[in-house]
Structures are given as C-alpha cells and as structure tokens.
Amino acid sequence: MSILKVHAREIFDSRGNPTVEVDLFTAKGLFRAAVPSGASTGIYEALELRDNDKTRYMGKGVSKAVEHINKTIAPALVSKKLNVVEQEKIDKLMIEMDGTENKSKFGANAILGVSLAVCKAGAVEKGVPLYRHIADLAGNAEVILPVPAFNVINGGSHAGNKLAMQEFMILPVGAENFREAMRIGAEVYHNLKNVIKEKYGKDATNVGDEGGFAPNILENKEALELLKNAIGKAGYSDKVVIGMDVAASEFYRSGKYDLDFKSPDDPSRYITPDELANLYKSFIRDYPVVSIEDPFDQDDWEAWQKFTASAGIQVVGDDLTVTNPKRIAKAVSEKSCNCLLLKVNQIGSVTESLQACKLAQSNGWGVMVSHRSGETEDTFIADLVVGLCTGQIKTVAPCRSERLAKYNQILRIEEELGSKAKFAGRSFRNPLAK
C-alpha cells in the first residue's frame, strides 16, 4: 500500500522543547510517530536539526526539519508510490536525498520521524503487531521481552547535584516475567524514595528529567549504597542487580577525569584512566554491579579496551559507538566494549538501527535499547526491543508518563503473547543463546 500523504508538525517533548511529529496516511489509516532528543549527546551522532533562531524557543525550534518533511520528503515519497512495507527502500531514498554523512541537510530528526511512521504503517499493512513486523525486518523468528533497567538515581548532566556519574540503575533480572520485573522495579523505587527522604530530607526526593531521584551527594559510592539499601528493604537482594551509566565524556579533562566537575575547576583533583578503572572495580567488588555504560571518554579507546578485557562485566558503548555502524565496527575490532546502547535517533532511521543491532549481535555483543532524556508519549522503542530480542531496555524510573508509556506497552505485548511470552531474565546479555 503506497503513502497517500505525509504531514509533519512541531510538538513538545518531556522537557518542554520542540520536537518533530509525523503523520503518515495510507488507505489503511493514519500512522503517527514522534522523535525523542538527548541531553548528553555524543559528538559522532547524526545531526538533530534545530533552527538556532534565538528569538524562538531559545533556538531549539524544529520548524526547518518539519519544513524539509512537508516540502521535500513528503512529495517524493507520495510520488514514488513506494509500499510502506519496503522499509529499507524508503529509508535509503531519504538518506540519498539528504546526501550528507550525518543527515545534516534534512536533520536526523526529520528522517527518523518519517522512518518510524513508515514502520508503524508497514506493520498494519502486513496485518501484524509492530514488534512482529520489526522482528521480520531484522530476520528474527522469535521475540523476547526485555529486562527493564530503571535509572533511579540521577547525576551528571541530568541533575543539579554534585554527583559526577549520570545514572544508577536497577535491573530485576530474577523476575519470572516482565510484569513481575515492573512490580519489583516499582517497589524498589518507592523504598528508595523513603531511604533518601530519611537520610537527606523530603526535598531530596524531587525527580530529574528522567524520573529518578537526584539527592545532593558527591560520592558515587553513596549512590550505590542507597540502591543496595533500598533493594534490601524491598526484599529483593537475590533478584535485583545494578547498572551504571557514567557518561564519562562529560567530565573528561585533557586525558584525565574530574569526579567533581560541577564545582569550580581544579586540575589537582583530576584522576587518571587507570585510577578511574580501579574505582569501577571496587564498585564491582562491593556491590552487585553487572553493567557499566560509557566508563571513559568517547575517544579514550585504550582505557575502554583495558577495562573491558579485565572487568568481567557488561561494558556498554553509547557515546563511544553512537549507534553508528562505522564506530561499532571499530569498537568490535579493538574489543573496546561488549554491548551496544541502541538509540534510534543517534543514527536516524529504522533500517540503520536494525543494521547496528545486527552488527553488534553478530559479533557476540549484547544490545540495550534506550530512550532519550527528552522523550514523548511515542512507544515505538517498546516494540523495537521486543522485536530485536535484545533482552534489555533502558527507559528509566517507573515515574513520569512519557517513560511509563514504554513500559506499559511492553506489558500489553507480554499479555498479547500469552503462553508464548519469553522473558530475558538473567540471560539479558545474550537472550538468543540456545
């Protein structure tokens, strides 16, 4: 079924910034997709086109991206009469029309908005759920429900506290199914709220951009201690493990790292990559830490490689790999990490996201599907994570409805699959292993 009409508009994300929404019409109806955006962005990401008109939305408007869709992409897709099930063909056409390495002509936010809407339309055209259509596009015969990684303590660029490391997460790997994982996550979250309130006062339980708490602590170890405490109080010490997203590029200073980067600059307190690696190893020794994302700067390749070889845990590349097949290939050959963080808006199309995922999986890596800090009510990544069988999803604390929208969609998928539902559980790093 061909595309009859495409119309884009500016809407708002969860931080009150404009973002792109696309309506795509076929004879089967209307298909709508909205594009997320990130706060800590890697320098190798596809370009998110903003207007930079300071008189409007502090320069963050996306009217140019919207115009590229309405005036250029839409007429091309309608006139070519492409079938919406031909995801790769449509994505390729948009990428070729853009003609730049990083999608800077139309903007990755323009191309992705259309790409997501096409994918939703393709599923209905085939008469299958979106997760099944995505599984077909990826060549997966089965689908798997992921372990949720709840980011419950926020620091770094996401929070106004002193904490350098950006995210402290809980993963309920011992749950029987996704619904139980959600219950465990919610109960630990509420216990954590009480633990923080008792120790730091009620105002320490205000939530950040991503629904997590941002108590004013400086020591990263203190965040782990709070988590351990809350997990124990909830009664789930045997079922919940911990993950971290350090986002170390944010505090990388000329070859070293500044764990107090939100205070006035003082080079005497910077630490070396080796000292930082030893700090991580002490966390792994003293707490159930099983996954660390972006432990070093996006260009500190040597530190990544040394750490991945010796840490014995999941090491996730986000700023390092930015969902970009070229960066992933380099990281694979250098053994820099062993898990890809998959963000559809870092690369800017469904087809390239699937390629990045398959490239990582075929090299024995894990893959974690992720939201962005500026989210919308769009639930595409819920179906994506199930269809791609990655076994793990990061869309933050069980708080704020733009986050819960994703979790609730996975609950519905689990219910729909019934007895066929498979939950990744403790195999979250490689759920397809036989």
Curated annotation (Swiss-Prot):
Binds two Mg(2+) per subunit. Required for catalysis and for stabilizing the dimer. Mg(2+) 1 binds at S40. Its cofactor is Mg(2+). Substrate binds at H158, E167, E293, D318, S370, H371, R372, S373, K394. Keywords: Acetylation, Cell membrane, Cytoplasm, Glycolysis, Hydroxylation, Isopeptide bond, Lyase, Magnesium, Membrane, Metal-binding, Phosphoprotein, Plasminogen activation, Ubl conjugation. Its main location: cytoplasm. The modification N6-succinyllysine is found at K60, K89, K228, K420. Signal peptide: none annotated. One of its GO terms (cellular component) is phosphopyruvate hydratase complex. Mg(2+) 2 binds at D245, E293, D318. The modification N-acetylserine is found at S2. ISGylated. The modification Phosphoserine is found at S254, S263, S291. PROSITE patterns: ENOLASE. It is an enzyme of class 4 (lyase). InterPro entries: Enolase, Enolase-like_C_sf, Enolase-like_N, Enolase_C, Enolase_CS, Enolase_N. The modification N6-acetyllysine is found at residues 5, 60, 64, 71, 89, 92, 126, 193, 199, 202, 228, 233, 256, 281, 335, 343, 406, 420. Induction: Expression increased up to 3-fold by hypoxic stress in vascular endothelial cells. It catalyses: (2R)-2-phosphoglycerate = phosphoenolpyruvate + H2O. One of its GO terms (biological process) is canonical glycolysis. Glycolytic enzyme the catalyzes the conversion of 2-phosphoglycerate to phosphoenolpyruvate. In addition to glycolysis, involved in various processes such as growth control, hypoxia tolerance and allergic responses. May also function in the intravascular and pericellular fibrinolytic system due to its ability to serve as a receptor and activator of plasminogen on the cell surface of several cell-types such as leukocytes and neurons. Stimulates immunoglobulin production. This is Alpha-enolase. It comes from Bos taurus (Bovine). The lineage of its organism: Eukaryota, Metazoa, Chordata, Craniata, Vertebrata. The gene is ENO1.
